[in-house]
């Protein structure tokens, strides 16, 4: 039996989960069709998903149709969970991209399609909700060709809310023959030579073109009324082909972790090559660590079943493997889809329990959520001791807050959400703190040079000190101190895009330790940073704005107000296409504004493109002034228990 792994993708409220539930029901995997409104869906299994009617975590189920086993991965539709969607792309053989016939193409739709196109993932476009009042399919077809691709093949016509095929193994419209010829040289040569070409020949060529992601078939339906679902199943089993196995050696990729109500850990793996068997002893990540497979399940017709073996391209589930982490692999390192650019969160907030004694409980719960979703980043601020979480958006914050309360029984409060800025030194500086020169309490001399690097370079660390004079353990301690120092600059944000050179060192052999160098480094670094000053960097987005020509003047005015950098404008009689860069902070709500003033016709698509020096206002990420921070570091070291906040002290260390 052929096995394929299919992603179901869509913008929010396009009916993605409803389509998935109908696929399960129509294929016989379930006895009734789950409804989002009723909270009885199979794929949205979390209580919060059922209650809010949105998908938070990618879920996997399975159907069989026309002799093909299809593992369906239902992904979140909200931008706040884009990291979950990106992980899914790595394991797909194909995708169904769902559009709402009423709302049309949204910014998320285009972002998803562009990624599918870039990664050359075979994709079927399914226009859902054709039963809705006010649907204008002709306008949507034009929108698809304008904003997604010209290489689409409309497989059906819609009459009175029902779908009828116009392209199949037995029949193909004349204009579609020309379409196929324009995309395949072999068919074109036969066509020009007046050779006989049957509908089946055209059909097989279309299958090949779809498999190569050169053509995108478009189907129609209504999940609400089970219209077009069987036709979609036929298209999936025809157009999405399984990859060829290249080896019999085990290669498996861990893409999902979940915990059951009793806390047992389930790890989901895609078997890339070979097979995984019960009681196998397998290697993790080419390391020296081996595990024994003590239990093994797969998904069959919507149910998890115990098996002795899971073969290539299928999904395996292993329970209670505590060492597993998302992204791990078993056996040979797999060749996964490349080219994904991970999007980092641009927001952060402090979180605290309503009851202070439950802080450790919150940290434990967040660690569990991090195991299930590695994009969830949290840390303890080394200065304020606050627990901070990085976020993609407000919806993610609300989901985390609800999960902590309902799943882990701990109520928390989130402080104001801030944009994540960064800092970079303004100029090259050098700073030295000498051994035995008060108030230096450490048996160490350290000199550091800081110099700015081009944006996007990151942190570079070099040493001018020979290992013959100062051995590895001492120098590594300095490097650790530098990395720690970069976590919080003068305004409390990460310091990046700089080179730090370890330029001077002195120690006393009987008493100096690596700890002296590790603990002194942050003081030297901070004083150097104060001497240099910093540029504040803000997150930037690359944008593409597609709007009707009549709205172009307003759009350009808006973009100027948002301090964008317009790189290209191209217009025709009907549409205007604008590209450029815009600060995240000024544009985070603009997609909904575009939809409003263009009456749903405009699309504002964005993706992260790094940081640049801010042109507008910014917020600090600190709770104490800078001199207090230096004092705080000395006191925290436990070397100086009490130190007077005297001007002489600050003068001495500066």
UniProtKB/Swiss-Prot annotation:
Binding site for GTP: 10-17, 74-78, 128-131
Domain tr-type G: 1-244
Entry annotated with the keyword Coiled coil: no
Keywords assigned: Antibiotic resistance, GTP-binding, Nucleotide-binding, Protein biosynthesis
Molecular functions (GO terms): GTP binding; GTPase activity
Annotated GO biological process: response to antibiotic; ribosome disassembly; translation
UniProt keyword Nucleotide-binding, yes or no: yes
Role description: Abolishes the inhibitory effect of tetracyclin on protein synthesis by a non-covalent modification of the ribosomes.
Family: Belongs to the TRAFAC class translation factor GTPase superfamily. Classic translation factor GTPase family. TetM/TetO subfamily.
PANTHER family listed in its UniProt record: RIBOSOME-RELEASING FACTOR 2, MITOCHONDRIAL, TRANSLATION ELONGATION FACTOR G-RELATED
Descriptive protein name: Tetracycline resistance protein TetQ
Originating species: Prevotella intermedia
Gene that this polypeptide is encoded by: tetQ
């Amino acid at each position: 039996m052929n096995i394929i792994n299919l992603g179901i993708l869509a913008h929010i409220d396009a009916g993605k989960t409803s389509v998935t539930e109908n696929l399960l029901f129509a294929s016989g995997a379930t006895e009734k069709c789950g409804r989002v409104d009723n909270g009885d869906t199979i794929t949205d299994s979390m209580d919060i998903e059922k209650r809010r009617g949105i998908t938070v975590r990618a879920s996997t189920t399975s159907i069989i149709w026309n002799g093909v086993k299809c593992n369906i991965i239902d992904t979140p539709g909200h931008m706040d969970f884009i990291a979950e969607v990106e992980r899914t792309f790595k394991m797909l053989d194909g995708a169904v991209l769902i559009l709402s016939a009423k709302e049309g193409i949204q910014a998320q739709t285009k972002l998803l399609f562009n990624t599918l196109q870039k990664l050359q993932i075979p994709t079927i476009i399914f226009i859902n909700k054709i039963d809705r009042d006010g649907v204008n399919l002709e306008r949507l077809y034009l929108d698809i060709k304008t904003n997604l691709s010209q290489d689409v093949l409309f497989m059906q016509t819609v009459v009175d809310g029902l779908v009828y095929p116009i392209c199949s193994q037995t029949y193909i419209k004349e204009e579609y023959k020309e379409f196929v010829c324009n995309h395949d040289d072999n068919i074109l040569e036969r066509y020009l030579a007046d050779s006989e070409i049957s509908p089946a020949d055209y059909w097989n060529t279309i299958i090949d073109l779809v498999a190569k992601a050169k053509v995108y078939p478009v189907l129609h339906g209504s999940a609400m009324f089970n219209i077009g679902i069987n036709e979609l199943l036929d298209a999936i089993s025809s157009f999405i082909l399984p990859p060829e196995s290249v080896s019999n050696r085990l290669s498996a990729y861990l893409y999902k972790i979940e915990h059951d109500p009793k806390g047992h850990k389930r790890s989901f793996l895609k078997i890339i090559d070979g097979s995984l068997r019960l009681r196998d002893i397998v290697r993790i990540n080419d390391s020296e660590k081996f595990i024994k497979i003590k239990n093994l399940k797969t998904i069959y017709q919507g149910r998890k079943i115990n098996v002795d073996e899971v073969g290539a391209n299928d999904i395996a589930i292993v329970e209670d493997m505590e060492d597993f982490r998302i992204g791990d692999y078993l056996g040979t390192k797999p060749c996964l889809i490349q080219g994904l650019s991970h999007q980092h969160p641009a927001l952060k907030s402090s979180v605290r329990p309503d009851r202070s004694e439950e802080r450790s409980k919150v940290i434990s719960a967040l660690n569990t959520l991090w195991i299930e979703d590695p994009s969830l980043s949290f840390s303890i601020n080394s200065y304020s001791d606050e627990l901070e979480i990085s976020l993609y958006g407000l919806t993610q914050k609300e989901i985390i807050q609800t999960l902590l309360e309902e799943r882990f029984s701990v109520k928390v409060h989130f402080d104001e959400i801030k944009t994540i800025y960064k800092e970079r030194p303004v100029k090259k500086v050098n700073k030295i703190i000498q051994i035995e020169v008060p108030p230096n309490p450490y048996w160490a001399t350290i000199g550091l040079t800081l110099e700015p690097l081009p944006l996007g370079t990151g942190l570079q660390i070099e040493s001018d000190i020979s290992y013959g004079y100062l051995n590895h353990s001492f120098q590594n301690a300095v490097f650790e101190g530098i990395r720690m120092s970069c976590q919080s600059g003068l305004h409390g944000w990460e310091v990046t895009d700089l080179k730090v050179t370890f330029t001077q060192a002195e120690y006393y052999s009987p008493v100096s330790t690596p700890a002296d160098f590790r603990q002194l480094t942050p003081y030297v670094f901070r004083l150097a940073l104060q001497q240099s000053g910093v540029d504040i960097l803000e997150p930037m987005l690359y944008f593409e704005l597609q709007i009707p020509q009549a709205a172009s003047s307003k759009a350009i005015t808006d973009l100027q107000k948002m301090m964008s950098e317009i790189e290209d404008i191209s217009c025709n009689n009907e549409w205007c296409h604008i590209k450029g860069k815009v600060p995240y902070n000024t544009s985070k709500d603009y997609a909904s504004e575009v939809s409003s003033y263009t009456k749903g016709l405009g699309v504002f698509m964005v993706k992260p493109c790094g940081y640049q020096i801010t042109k507008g206002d910014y917020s600090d990420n600190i709770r104490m002034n800078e001199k207090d921070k230096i004092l705080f570091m000395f006191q925290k070291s436990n070397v100086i228990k009490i130190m007077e906040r005297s001007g002489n002290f600050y003068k001495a260390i500066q």
